[in-house]
Amino acid sequence: RGLGDVYKRQDNITSVTVEKNGEREKIPCSACVLATGQGARDTYHILYDIGLELLPKAFAVGVRIEHPRELIDRSQYGEFASHPRLGAAEYHLADKAGNRGVYSFCMCPGGVVVASSSGPEQVVTNGMSRHARDEQNSNAAIVVQVDSRDYTVGPLGGLDFQEQIERAAYYAGGGDFTAPAERVGDFLRKAAPKAFGSVKPTYRPGVCRSNLYQCLPDFVSEGIRAGITAFGRRLKGFDMDDAVITAVESRTSSPVRIQRDEEGCATRMKGLYPVGEGAGYAGGIVSAAVDGICLLYTSPSPRDMRR
């Protein structure tokens, strides 16, 4: 179901309308936990239109990078790589590119790059590892910090920024949800993209060899370039020519925060409890779950729901 409308009387929630398969249902309520994901962009617009306090929030965008799993294992484990008691190796990397942070995010050892679009004319990447973590490649997002100086003024400006680069990636990939990708060596040298080498991209439905500078803002491209170079000095082989980068990773966290009061209510609507990633208070599955649990045990109305 999707959120249709939210109704209030004297700043207290009275009902919500939800939509499913084109049908609308109005549900009376005095308390509602709003636990959307950050991809529910229409919800932000609904809340903005009814006067809720929304604030822009820093986030990060970039690309997915893929290396051979065995290379990352050797770089991290050394002589113990491939030991049966050790799983696929992980890494966590961070550096500065000028006055911005650049870092790895959501590292997926022995995993694949997956499509994560939530609407038309978008290419959005993510990563996942299956239980065995035994795929040929390991991948992670390499992202650069973005804040309100980088996009149009207003609480929803970050959404517009995300949509612009997602649309650029969509068309750079050919307009059929194929993702633009290139070898790291070509990206670092700003050379024309060559055929993929020893590392094969795993994104489905597939990739299109592209110059990623054409679908990323300059400060993001240069930040990624500086970051990969720095990470190559710390993790042997990280900047290998045949590593593959695929655009774009744009959903690291919400660019919007729904303001809450000390009881967890939306500041301009009593009884509406925004929680988790979509509300701007979490940056992943576990932190979103923790935010929901904290709300349940600390806020008056959700506490009553436990009965």
Where are these regions (language model features)?
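Flavin (primarily FAD) binding-site architecture
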Residues: 39-49
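Short hydrophobic core segments
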Residues: 27-37
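C-terminal catalytic lobe of FAD-dependent flavoproteins
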Residues: 124-213
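Mid-to-C-terminal "cap/lid" subdomains and adjacent gly/pro-rich loops that border
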Residues: 56-146
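Single conserved hydrophobic/aromatic residue that forms the stacking wall/gate
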Residues: 2-7, 297-307
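A glycine-rich dinucleotide-binding beta-alpha-beta segment and adjacent secondary-structure elements
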Residues: 210-276, 289
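Conserved beta-strand-loop-beta-strand element in the redox core of flavoprotein oxidoreductases
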Residues: 8-25
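A conserved FAD-binding loop/helix module that cradles the flavin
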Residues: 280-296
